[in-house]
Amino acid sequence: MVTTHNLGFPRIGAKRELKFGLERYWKGESSRDELKALGAELRRRHWHDQRDLDLAPIGDFAFYDQVLDMSFTLGNLPKRVQDFHGDALDNAFRVARGRSAQSAEAHAACCGGVAAGEMTKWFDTNYHYIVPEFHADTNFSLDPSRLLQQLAEANAQGVNAKPVILGPVTYLWLGKAKDDSDRLALLPKLLPVYGALLDTLTAQGVEWVQIDEPILVTELDAEWRQAFRTAYAALETRRINLLLATYFGQLQDNLTLAASLPVDGLHIDAINARDEVDALVRELPPERVLSIGAINGRNIWKTDLNATLDWLEPLAKQLGDRLWLAPSCSLLHVPVDLANEAKLDAEIRSWLAFALQKLDELKVLATALNEGRDTVADALAANAAAIESRRRSPRVNNPAVKAAIARIDARLGNRASPYAQRASKQSARLNLPAFPTTTIGSFPQTAEIRQARSRFKAGTLDEAGYRTAMQAEIERSVREQESLELDVLVHGEAERNDMVEYFGEQLDGYAFSQFGWVQSYGSRCVKPPILFGDISRPKAMTVEWITYAQSLTNKPMKGMLTGPVTILNWSFVRDDQPRSVSCYQLALAIRDEVLDLEQAGVRVIQIDEAALREGLPLRRAQWSEYLKWAVESFRITANGVQDDTQIHTHMCYSEFNDIIASIADMDADVITIETSRSDMELLDAFDDFKYPNEIGPGVYDIHSPNIPTQDHIVGLMRKAAERIPAERLWVNPDCGLKTRQWGEVIPALTNMVAAAKTLRNQVR
């Protein structure tokens, strides 16, 4: 019999209940007990949703981040919070979000100032984790209370629970040594704590533990490979079954290593690594379980169940009870329930599967394998009809778009002149001071903005009323920026619910869910648009708002666009053509918008590529192909403008050392980047590579409520000036200010502008 299980379930709730609960707590509008009760209710509901599985995950739920939770389980708290002895949940929030010494937040609880932990992308997804911090003298100690509480809840509910933990080697790999010590030197101290955790779970009657080691799909040197052998030899003696889980890619040169580790089962992502399954069947010892991730855990298209069964049936005969079925990875990366999407186009809806529907697909596959296809004939027939409907739909294929793609040539992506000539013309046109100040684009999305948007979508506010409300918010943003004496202004993006969804709503080839939310980090959720067909732009998308904002000021107003690579990487993308083709389609559509903005007199246009690095394949050998079409797409978008139009781009959570040449090849006049959480470490890339254009290193962390001091910003910019000539430096936050409050934004920007003025005086 085939065993079904799940690697993880979305934690936010079908209607973002966790997000709203967290924000109420952080604002002091609810108690800690109420927040914990909400978490317990969500877990109860989610285990009920997974009741048909043979094994359901526990430990996948986290109030903020599962990697942060693992740090607390292992007793690895950053030194700056080790002296706080309050509730563990509040301590976790301190690490994740930071606390300013003057924090107005309830529950800041006399903490004094605490810097937020560094946050970065979870592999090549749009989820973010809090980076574990290590020092040479780091010690570990077990705190299993979180897992044991969830296990007790699951047992009381009758759940056949499978705890999910992050493996020791991946945990070290994901972290950062704050003193430049060797992370792997900590492995001997870490392994006994893992062993004690497994012993604790064994004592509670747990039979299987899922231990996630996704770095096995990356390129590992000999030292890291040996760490796997060392770690699992040490854990082999525990009297508990270990399912080693890999996902997000192929094992490739790590396949033999993974198959040889002394564990009881191995999970493989068969969406990305189907070609490796036969080799694993040959190499795995005959008693070992092979878990096949046959359902795509990262995208929302229905699985072709009949084709999947054609592939699985011979494996089931060969493996028998050793065959397990699961999604390819945790379902954290997809929305919860398609059944809530009453407003979604019926035809497109028939092509989709969210988390609950993916579990239904899993059940159909397992039933067909265990009892025969006849027992699920109706479900298989309905699935086949949906697959064929999508394949044949004229809404998916647009001949005019395909013809435009065929006409793309290299000249389309070239500026008329090199940067040095452009910079001279832009300087004359813009007349900016040294260390010019700007923001990344968005300002706080206030309750009034959200209410107006909600009323407009509900039909209780007409278009004229909505436009008036948004213009009032834009004017407020402009006046605040003028008062702060910023140099290049933005309109604040009041009219935008999301930097990707806003554009997708206005492009043909996109569809939109109502409740298709996924977690990005903490309480931050995004609702990726659904790229289902060929992309085109029917009309201008931003010109009206930007030209209105420019009419309110004599200072330069940035046109704000999201770039094609980021729109692609932050969408649920069609899987019936190469991603590069979809990206080129987006590039042509956004290029039309760039040219319309320039025609309307906009002098500075920012094309955000926040997710450029996120799309990199996990293996470097595949980077060049991705970077080629990603950079080409940006250049197609940006490079049709005149020399005196200044093109900006923004990237966040990115490390640049290994792709700096490609970033330079994008040829943006100004790039703004996230650097504050890493204390300008990201600028190390510029020690050896002389970046030719202008750059704005982010000088304060917008993800934290902390208010940066003027001296702190000056210090960061001095570090930046050691690597980048002062005349090519900008001063800006590290990301948009949408999620902050005006009461935080104004003092932070006041200090930022004051710092820029100090710097100008120092370089005179």
UniProtKB/Swiss-Prot annotation:
Cofactor field: Zn(2+)
EC nos: 2.1.1.14
Positions of L-homocysteine binding: 440-442, 493, 608
Cofactor binding note of this UniProt entry: Binds 1 zinc ion per subunit.
Catalytic activity: 5-methyltetrahydropteroyltri-L-glutamate + L-homocysteine = tetrahydropteroyltri-L-glutamate + L-methionine
Residues that coordinate or bind 5-methyltetrahydropteroyltri-L-glutamate: 16-19, 121, 524-525, 570, 614
One example GO MF annotation: zinc ion binding
Involved pathway(s): Amino-acid biosynthesis; L-methionine biosynthesis via de novo pathway; L-methionine from L-homocysteine (MetE route): step 1/1
Active site per the UniProt annotation: 703
Sites where the protein binds Zn(2+): 650, 652, 674, 735
Keywords carried by this UniProt record: Amino-acid biosynthesis, Metal-binding, Methionine biosynthesis, Methyltransferase, Repeat, Transferase, Zinc
InterPro entries: Cbl-indep_Met_Synth_N, Cobalamin-indep_Met_synthase, Met_Synth_C/arc, UROD/MetE-like_sf
Family affiliation: Belongs to the vitamin-B12 independent methionine synthase family.
Function: Catalyzes the transfer of a methyl group from 5-methyltetrahydrofolate to homocysteine resulting in methionine formation.
Protein's name according to its UniProt entry: 5-methyltetrahydropteroyltriglutamate--homocysteine methyltransferase
The organism of origin for this protein: Burkholderia cenocepacia (strain ATCC BAA-245 / DSM 16553 / LMG 16656 / NCTC 13227 / J2315 / CF5610) (Burkholderia cepacia (strain J2315))
